[in-house]
């Protein structure tokens, strides 16, 4: 149960036969820091009679996490190929994170459980002691960065996370999956190549600028005399803006007029989502990455990002505005060029256009700490704060 006072201090269990002050140097089990909203590992190199402090915020508002063997959460079924894929992807993420600067937060791994809703059926524990547990729609795991691997998340911490907006986020992601779009896919399919190429090229004149002064994708003012592309709905855009946009979704950014799209064919294996990784961003909101059983070698799923200001926990009745990316295919040519290929260039242009448009439509909270997306030259995605980097190369 979460303490009801932020000044509360949870001290570790220590053994002492005398009243003499002693000093210990041992690595403790995991702790949950309520102030940082993250898991921590603490070196007890201090007065044994003093409380353990979080190394990030230097606060004592922490709770020791019980050993996973005592948890009622089911252990990861390591025999399945899907879970082996999740663990290998997770280890790769951890290796990349450790090679970069020390981050101030860590992810929660969410796997699809056997339950179909909020309250699952009762099943017998694996220990064979006759006790039962509730099979949940989602199973939560975490890694505290100590090298011990994934552990089941204790029920008490799961309840805290669900109460902080995770439950609503998971419901939204489930609705996206059920609608057939999938996590990381846009609501509209990409426009067909022939439809994009058939868009007429027009020279922007004063007549055009009187009707539309700005490109709706990048929001920049049109300059008379430059070339633009005209949609069938008669809306005008920069060619470098509307082509990447239509390569992601087939609708007009202004009126939602839809261009023809190619039939989408996906195998059942490719559609099977095993689980996801959720980052609680310090500035508010979440970043979500999906583990997929059908991911081919050299292929990555770039994350969908939902922010609290867009329906991630502020009580808005609107659906979440989300930035959705397609699969990133890494070819031998991209590997040799460090990820700089023609496809990579087009993806980066699409990112710039999407970010510019999302900046325009995203409601403001009166703060300069809104989140934007940045695509590194090597094709990796980061969620950025306008003043501080929040996520460092997590895929």
Swiss-Prot record:
Where in the chain are the RING-type zinc fingers? Answer: 215-256
Q: What does this protein do?
A: E3 ubiquitin-protein ligase involved in the positive regulation of abscisic acid-dependent drought stress responses. Involved in the positive regulation of responses to salt and osmotic stresses during seed germination and early seedling development. Possesses E3 ubiquitin ligase activity in vitro.
Explain the induction of this protein.
Induced by abscisic acid (ABA), and drought and salt stresses.
Instruction: Give the source's domain of life in one word.
Output: Eukaryota
Q: What is its main location?
A: cytoplasm
- GO biological process assignments: abscisic acid-activated signaling pathway; protein autoubiquitination; response to abscisic acid; response to water deprivation
Keyword NADP (UniProt): no
Query: Which Gene3D superfamilies does the protein's record reference?
Result: Zinc/RING finger domain, C3HC4 (zinc finger)
Quote the tissue specificity entry: Expressed in root tips, leaf tips, junction of carpels and pedicels, stigma, anthers, pollen, vasculature of sepals and petals, immature seeds and embryos.
Keywords from the UniProt entry: Abscisic acid signaling pathway, Cytoplasm, Metal-binding, Nucleus, Stress response, Transferase, Ubl conjugation pathway, Zinc, Zinc-finger
Its name, as the record gives it, is E3 ubiquitin-protein ligase RDUF1
Where found, per UniProt? Cytoplasm, Cytosol; Nucleus
What is the documented disruption phenotype for this protein?
No visible phenotype under normal growth conditions. Mutant plants have decreased sensitivity to abscisic acid (ABA) and reduced tolerance to drought stress.
């Amino acid at each position: 149960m979460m303490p009801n006072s932020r000044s509360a201090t949870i001290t570790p269990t220590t053994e002492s036969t005398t009243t003499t002050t002693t000093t210990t140097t041992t690595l403790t089990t995991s702790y949950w820091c309520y102030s940082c909203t993250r898991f921590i590992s603490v070196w007890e190199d201090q007065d044994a009679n003093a409380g353990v402090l979080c190394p990030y915020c230097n606060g004592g508002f922490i709770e020791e996490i019980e050993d996973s063997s005592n948890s009622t959460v089911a252990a990861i079924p390591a025999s399945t190929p899907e879970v082996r894929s999740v663990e290998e992807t997770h280890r790769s993420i951890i290796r990349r994170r450790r090679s970069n600067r020390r981050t101030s937060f860590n992810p929660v791994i969410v796997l699809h459980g056997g339950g179909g809703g909020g309250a699952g059926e009762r099943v017998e524990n694996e220990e064979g002691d006759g006790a039962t547990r509730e099979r949940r729609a989602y199973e939560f795991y975490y890694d505290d960065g100590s090298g011990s691997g994934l552990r089941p998340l204790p029920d008490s911490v799961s309840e805290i996370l669900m109460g902080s907006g995770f439950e609503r986020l998971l419901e939204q992601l489930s609705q996206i999956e059920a609608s057939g779009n999938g996590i990381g896919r846009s609501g509209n399919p990409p426009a067909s190549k022939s439809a994009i190429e058939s868009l007429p090229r027009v020279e922007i004149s004063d007549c055009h600028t009187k009707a539309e002064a700005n490109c709706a994708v990048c929001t920049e003012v049109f300059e008379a005399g430059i070339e633009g592309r005209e949609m069938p709905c008669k809306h005008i855009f920069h060619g470098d803006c509307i082509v990447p946009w239509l390569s992601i979704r087939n609708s007009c950014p202004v009126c939602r007029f839809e261009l023809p799209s190619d039939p989408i064919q996906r195998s059942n294996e490719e559609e099977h989502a095993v689980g996801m990784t959720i980052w609680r961003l310090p500035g508010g909101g979440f970043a979500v990455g999906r583990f997929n059983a059908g991911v081919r070698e050299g292929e990555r799923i770039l994350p969908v990002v939902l922010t609290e200001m867009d329906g991630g926990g502020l009580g808005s009745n609107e659906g979440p505005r989300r930035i959705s990316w397609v699969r990133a295919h890494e070819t031998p040519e991209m590997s040799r060029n460090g990820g700089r290929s023609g496809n990579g260039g087009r993806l980066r242009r699409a990112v710039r256009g999407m970010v510019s448009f999302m900046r325009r439509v995203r409601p403001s909270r009166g703060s300069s700490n809104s989140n934007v997306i940045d695509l590194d030259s090597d094709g990796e995605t980061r969620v950025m704060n306008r003043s501080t980097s929040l996520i460092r190369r997590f895929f």
